[in-house]
Amino acid sequence: MKLLILTCLVAVALARPKHPINHRGLSPEVPNENLLRFVVAPFPEVFRKENINELSKDIGSESTEDQAMEDAKQMKAGSSSSSEEIVPNSAEQKYIQKEDVPSERYLGYLEQLLRLKKYNVPQLEIVPKSAEEQLHSMKEGNPAHQKQPMIAVNQELAYFYPQLFRQFYQLDAYPSGAWYYLPLGTQYTDAPSFSDIPNPIGSENSGKTTMPLW
């Protein structure tokens, strides 16, 4: 709108005659008052250089604002696309960490198996040595063994894992119960007969004993 007004004013200024018009019947020596007013009238303020510069600055600022808005929109679109790309990468990293690092529950089960193996339970002889070595290394805080995945150990323990815990799940609550599972090499002795049990021998003054009062 400002640009249109500026062009109209410039066109009007260019269309104005440079020299006063000589009317018929008037001598050049006696100018008309209206012509003098027209010639002597000051140049309109609208056509000054300062106003023209201000109008040009306003038009330039509007164009720069439009460009800034477009640049901001492009930046937002680029940031949203980059954030969408970053999200799946973080999810993949979490999934990889879950596969590599063993869970606390798994380590607890493994500790139970190794502890029960000390009681010479025959069913626990199938525990692989790799599981024992890995558990000891993780307890000592060796980072080389902690970074190794537990997939191989899980495959070794998969075939006997549920059956052992169904049979020995009570041993964790009652540690003394492990002593009831005797090793295979033990020999069972027969119980003594009633004839071998000696009769109790009492003193003669047993009937005269008095109990102290507390």
From Swiss-Prot:
PANTHER family reported for this sequence: ALPHA-S1-CASEIN
Region (Disordered): 59-91
Swiss-Prot/TrEMBL keywords: Calcium, Milk protein, Phosphoprotein, Secreted, Signal
Remarks, miscellaneous: The sequence shown is variant form B.
Keyword check for Phosphoprotein: yes
One BP term from GO: response to dehydroepiandrosterone
Family: Belongs to the alpha-casein family.
Matching Pfam families: Casein
Modified residues (Phosphoserine): 61, 63, 79-83, 90, 130
InterPro entries, alphabetized: Alpha-s1_casein (IPR026999), Casein (IPR001588), Casein_CS (IPR031305)
Organism: Capra hircus (Goat)
Identification of the protein by name: Alpha-S1-casein
A GO-annotated cellular component: extracellular space
Its job: Important role in the capacity of milk to transport calcium phosphate.
Signal peptide location: 1-15
Compartments, as annotated in UniProt: Secreted
Tissue distribution of the protein: Mammary gland specific. Secreted in milk.
PROSITE patterns: CASEIN_ALPHA_BETA
